[in-house]
Amino acid sequence: MTLLITGDSIVSAEAVWDHVTMANRELAFKAGDVIKVLDASNKDWWWGQIDDEEGWFPASFVRLWVNQEDEVEEGPSDVQNGHLDPNSDCLCLGRPLQNRDQMRANVINEIMSTERHYIKHLKDICEGYLKQCRKRRDMFSDEQLKVIFGNIEDIYRFQMGFVRDLEKQYNNDDPHLSEIGPCFLEHQDGFWIYSEYCNNHLDACMELSKLMKDSRYQHFFEACRLLQQMIDIAIDGFLLTPVQKICKYPLQLAELLKYTAQDHSDYRYVAAALAVMRNVTQQINERKRRLENIDKIAQWQASVLDWEGEDILDRSSELIYTGEMAWIYQPYGRNQQRVFFLFDHQMVLCKKDLIRRDILYYKGRIDMDKYEVVDIEDGRDDDFNVSMKNAFKLHNKETEEIHLFFAKKLEEKIRWLRAFREERKMVQEDEKIGFEISENQKRQAAMTVRKVPKQKGVNSARSVPPSYPPPQDPLNHGQYLVPDGIAQSQVFEFTEPKRSQSPFWQNFSRLTPFKK
């Protein structure tokens, strides 16, 4: 590695996970970014560049491109700028081009190797930790074990079947001829079990943090690790591996597709598998984002006066759309102006204060699971005996109740109709993968919004690597997870970029009572 750098070759590394940092001299990046490595003399922290930014980054957060030392010198590449053309063969300059079949074989071998190591880690968690915990009823309740380990046993069983099929497709003599794409397609529905695990992971970390304040639990978990002859990583590091693993599949498949010729029998299967796994990680990331927003929903509900009935979080986890419309509940009823908040499963009706327009009063809700949306053409409605423009109805399929709504503009009506379709789609997808908010997450949201204090910046000069230990990949034999002072949830993020905060939350800040 150092020889390549000192030999004036451009050495590129791909980010396996996001590196979110609050230190000025560290280099921040997202999973999938390509980093130009400038200094690898320190085994833990490397110095690299993306675009015009330079800084230190943990070596364990990146992976050197396979076959890098064997590729051809070409013209200036986007690799130098931290971006890579997926159709480009240039990952490093200054070496002769290696046979594409050998490149594909290297990627296949890497995939198989990581899968075998991953299975061992899952086995260690289930047999080394969970099995031993179940024997100690005096220390762990069933509820605690469910929070800490989630559905790790389901993941272990699924992965064993998946790896078994991978091994059948692996060509030991000629790895480049292996056809592993179909394995991902055959097991695509099974990968959704990772959603439950990832959503529960924050609860697991909090529960472990509470237990680790007691030295008995520290000694117990360490004894479990030694008894199972596991590598020197704390239990929270092992429990992080499934979160990391599901994020890594799109990166591996993208690299495999890059070195798979279009006339290869596995090409179309790998391309399809890449699309499937990108969708899986994107949806898991989306649900993680929603869980991060539930405290905002709880805060908003607390700001609404005269609230009645169940909490929003008892059924919903996402604000989809909001706006002000005219509303008639029953035939010959009075036209009323209301502010509507559409969540998954329900729509909340609020009234603005006559004097303080930023104060909201609760006026009811509509169960979206029982209603269907009916688009209405402009004209006169015989049922309500009113002239309609930019109108639509919500019709209760059981009781025949009807709500009539009037948007101010046609564009606003179209946005509402689109939002209702999105709400139904979200509900169906959540039901498919069993997405729900845990009782512990609801309690946490009801109590407070967890805030991470910002650290003061430091000199951005190159100087020396950070003094604290770097975060390490538990799939390798590292010892640490996160630098001191940096929350674990900030370091390990999902593959897909986070969506920006919904503009609706900006509206909420204007609709809170008694603003100072």
Swiss-Prot record:
Residues with Phosphoserine modification: S502
PROSITE patterns: DH_2, PH_DOMAIN, SH3
Domain of life where this protein originates: Eukaryota
Swiss-Prot/TrEMBL GO biological process terms: regulation of postsynaptic specialization assembly; regulation of small GTPase mediated signal transduction
Span of domain SH3: 8-67
Alphabetical list of InterPro entries matching this protein: ARHGEF9_SH3, DBL_dom_sf, DH_dom, PH-like_dom_sf, PH_domain, SH3-like_dom_sf, SH3_domain, SOS1_NGEF_PH
Domain PH: from-to ranges: 318-425
Pfam families: RhoGEF (PF00621), SH3_2 (PF07653), SOS1_NGEF_PH (PF22697)
Keyword Phosphoprotein: yes
Record keywords, A-Z: Cytoplasm, Disease variant, Epilepsy, Guanine-nucleotide releasing factor, Phosphoprotein, SH3 domain, Synapse
Gene Ontology CC terms: cytosol; GABA-ergic synapse; postsynaptic density; postsynaptic specialization
Keyword Hydrolase included in the entry's annotation: no
Xref: SMART domains: PH (SM00233), RhoGEF (SM00325), SH3 (SM00326)
Tissue expression profile of the protein: Detected in brain. Detected at low levels in heart.
Annotated region (Disordered), positions in chain: 453-480
An annotated Gene Ontology molecular function: guanyl-nucleotide exchange factor activity
Subcellular location: Cytoplasm; Postsynaptic density
Interaction with GPHN, as annotated region: 100-110
Subunit-level organization: Interacts with GPHN.
Known function: Acts as a guanine nucleotide exchange factor (GEF) for CDC42. Promotes formation of GPHN clusters.
Listed name of the protein: Rho guanine nucleotide exchange factor 9
Species the sequence originates in: Homo sapiens
